Each structure stands twice: as structure tokens, then as C-alpha cells.
Swiss-Prot record:
Pathway membership, UniProt: Purine metabolism; AMP biosynthesis via salvage pathway; AMP from adenine: step 1/1
The species this protein was found in: Anaeromyxobacter sp. (strain Fw109-5)
The enzyme's E.C. designation: 2.4.2.7
Location, primary (coarse class): cytoplasm
Listed name of the protein: Adenine phosphoribosyltransferase
Cellular compartments annotated: Cytoplasm
Protein family membership: Belongs to the purine/pyrimidine phosphoribosyltransferase family.
GO cellular component: cytoplasm
Keyword annotations: Cytoplasm, Glycosyltransferase, Purine salvage, Transferase
Chain ranges passing through the membrane: none
CDD domains per record: PRTases_typeI
Subunit note: Homodimer.
Any GO molecular function: adenine phosphoribosyltransferase activity
Gene: apt
Catalytic EC class: transferase
């Protein structure tokens, strides 16, 4: 796949941090992308270009870096914004979805009125790794009767199999490693 000059510039800003958060992991640090107004704008513009014709009515940002992309994307699309958070972080009634980690479990929550039946929902996060968190959010969306249009990410770590877990046809990533 040929990458645009804009996405090449974004890729060049992503910093590899070895052995973070633990030994053997190479963390993809997106903070330099966010710090540079040109590359941050390129990212948001690329998301908007992909989703502008899909009649998205709600964008769900996954805690916490997903919020950084979901908010400007929702604004640009004229869609509502809601957030999926860790348990106990949302102030009103919630629904919860548990997902498995390599060692144990975690969960995410949405307000019970965050998405409604018939809404067309896009789930957004910064990085797709194994797909566990995104899958949990997708289940929260569909449990409320909304249509899960797709998942969209800045970065996909293809070697971890997240797109396969979510269904490749439902996954969009601006950059893949």
C-alpha cells in the first residue's frame, strides 16, 4: 500500500520506546504526533476523510488516548461524542463489559444512555493491539441497540492480531506496523 506524504510524516513522529511499560515491549509513543500541530491536523483530517460519508451519528472514544482523536473527529463529522471509561469513572448509571487480559480481566463502561438504538456508531482509539478493549466497547454499543459501523485507530499493531479478532472488514487504521 502506498502511503501519502502526510501519513509518512505522521509515522516519522511516532517514537519507539523500548522496554516500556515492561521489558520486551516496544511502545509506540504517539505524543510527538499530538504535540505537532501539522501532524495532529493530518491525522484528524485523514480520519474525517475516511468517515465523512458514512452517516456516523455517534463517536465513542476509548479511555484515554482514544478521547484525543474521538472528540475532534465527532466535531468534524457533526456527530455526538461519548466515552468508554474504566469502572467507577463515569458519574451516572452505566453498563459494563468485561474483557480478558493475558493475566486476568478488565472492564469498560458506558453510560446507559450513551448510545441509542438506531444510531450509527464509530469506535475510536489510538492503537489497536490485541483488540480486547475495542471488542468490549463494540459489545457495549451493540447491547444498547446501536449499529456498530466500524473501529478506527491511528495505529494498528498487526502482529498482535487485533483486526482478526474484531473482523478485518470492520477495522480502519491510518498506520500499520
Amino acid at each position: 500500500m502506498v502511503m501519502s506524504a502526510a501519513m509518512e510524516a505522521v509515522r516519522a513522529r511516532i517514537r519507539d520506546v523500548p522496554d516500556f511499560p515492561q521489558k520486551g515491549i516496544v511502545f509506540k509513543d504517539i505524543t510527538p504526533v499530538l504535540a505537532d500541530p501539522t501532524t495532529f491536523r493530518e491525522v484528524i483530517d485523514a480520519f474525517v476523510a475516511r468517515w465523512k460519508d458514512e452517516r456516523i451519528s455517534k463517536v465513542v472514544g476509548i479511555e484515554s488516548r482514544g478521547f484525543l482523536f474521538a472528540a475532534p473527529l465527532a466535531y468534524a463529522l457533526g456527530a455526538g461524542l461519548t466515552i468508554a471509561r474504566k469502572p467507577g469513572k463515569l458519574p451516572w448509571e452505566t453498563i459494563r463489559e468485561v474483557y480478558s487480559l493475558e493475566y486476568g480481566e478488565n472492564s469498560l463502561e458506558l453510560h446507559i444512555d450513551a448510545v441509542k438504538a438506531g444510531e450509527r456508531v464509530l469506535v475510536v482509539d489510538d492503537v489497536l493491539a490485541t483488540g480486547g478493549t475495542a471488542d468490549a466497547v463494540g459489545r457495549l454499543v451493540t447491547r444498547q441497540g446501536a449499529t456498530l459501523v466500524a473501529y478506527s485507530f491511528l495505529v494498528e499493531l498487526g502482529f498482535l492480531g487485533g483486526a482478526k479478532r474484531l473482523g478485518r472488514e470492520h477495522v480502519h487504521a491510518l498506520l500499520s506496523y
